[in-house]
Amino acid sequence: MTATPKPLVLIILDGFGHSESPDYNAIYAAKKPVWDRLLATQPHGLISGSGMDVGLPDGQMGNSEVGHMNLGAGRVVYQDFTRVTKAIRDGEFFENPVIAAAVDKAVAADKAVHILGLLSPGGVHSHEDHLVAMAQMAARRGAGKIYLHAFLDGRDTPPKSAQPSLERLDATFAGLGKGRIASIIGRYFAMDRDNRWDRVQAAYELIVDGKAEFTADSSVAALEAAYARGESDEFVKATAVVPAGAEAVRVEDGDAVIFMNFRADRARELSRAFVEPAFKEFPREQAPQLAGFVMLTQYAASIPAPCAFPPEPLTNVLGEYLAKHGKTQLRIAETEKYAHVTFFFSGGREEPYEGEERILIPSPKVATYDLQPEMSAPEVTDRIVEAIEQQRYDVIVVNYANGDMVGHTGVFEAAVKAVECLDTCMGRIVEALDKVGGEALITADHGNVEQMEDESTGQAHTAHTCEPVPFVYVGKRKLSIREGGVLADVAPTMLTLMGLEQPAEMTGRSIVTLG
């Protein structure tokens, strides 16, 4: 086989979609000479990263976990969101043996069922339809005490949009004639993923001990008070919902706890606080002996709790296939997206493959990334340039977090700076590749930074989008790019560029035609 250019670098610009509209489009507003030059001189197109094209419901915006799964698998991966929704529609959810075992054990002892999860129609980490179904299931199975501990979104949804979701669940419980919302707290606390354990502690103590900074007699009153304090949904402080004559809800021995987030990365820390016997990240006043703690999906193999929807193994994903062919690969990202470029890109596998190395660059310790829109991109780029110069790797996969993480802040000026930083970083990579004769593919996992304001409300747009994402070839070869590509087509494209045959399990189609 003739030698192919080396290395082949896959650059994933997280949250970097394409919008025809210049309005509140941080990419359009940024000074980006490198990006402009690439689009003027290199083969490029657009590919889809949302909806059915990535195994999500129609019209559902893509996200980082889903995007990286599809990119690495080389096939459309049927997402947990869709699996759970389908199980609810088919009725299988209500007989799920793992959830049923925990609920039935609590019911038999006249104990409570606690439902945890992000109460949101966002569909990124959870969906409120699933929380409604869980409340219905608990009631059907005879639970008299059903409590929802609602984590509020404002990140994958508009910043102040929780009220309809709270009202919907209040109505669900009213219709069941039992159960209620017991607490609300922003996802900033309950769903940390960066080992900021003081945040997780606030959520744990609210749920388990009923310890809250604030109390209110209804969920909507709790939310209104938070807004009056200047908090948006994501940052709502621990609030116990205590109707007149009631007490703050606590988790007691013999209760069942069901965590209804389907995405793993932001559910791990709180889960560990509940179930790890030797948990030491913060002191727990109470560690109740539960009838069961159920993860909706497997948040991590190391968490000692059952999951209702275990992973469906993927074989011959890109990383595995490269290893089988004796190829070397480097995965690199900063903390915020490290799991995506390793665990998710490898189809849900924690361990590196043979010949795979990983570099984790710490994300800056700032409260929100608009305060440092460059994040750790320059340091990530230093290591990539070094790796390209060494010519040790056949493939380098890198994630740049800026577009997504700064996009989520809703701060337009910071998002523009993030894009300008990315442009500089891409310039350094392209220059390094030019010197060694390497190639790159530049794409994204989903959109975000190209829409920074919600046109209908005038609020900051902090969520992902359904826009297509760019696909750019960087190199010396003559090739053409077809239209209609999806994220699942990227891995087959890489194999085409490397001269490797595509395995049968990869059902994606190469986006490029050589020659």
From Swiss-Prot:
GO biological processes: glucose catabolic process; glycolytic process
Record keywords, A-Z: Glycolysis, Isomerase, Manganese, Metal-binding
Functional pathway: Carbohydrate degradation; glycolysis; pyruvate from D-glyceraldehyde 3-phosphate: step 3/5
Catalysed reactions, as listed in the record: (2R)-2-phosphoglycerate = (2R)-3-phosphoglycerate
Annotated residues for binding of Mn(2+) 2: 14, 64, 445-446
EC category: isomerase
Entry GO MF terms: manganese ion binding; phosphoglycerate mutase activity
InterPro entries to which the protein is assigned, alphabetical: Alkaline_phosphatase_core_sf, BPG-indep_PGM_N, Metalloenzyme, PGAM_B_sf, Pgm_bpd_ind
Physiological role: Catalyzes the interconversion of 2-phosphoglycerate and 3-phosphoglycerate.
HAMAP family assigned: GpmI (MF_01038)
Stated family: Belongs to the BPG-independent phosphoglycerate mutase family.
Name of the molecule in the record: 2,3-bisphosphoglycerate-independent phosphoglycerate mutase
Originating organism: Pseudomonas aeruginosa (strain UCBPP-PA14)
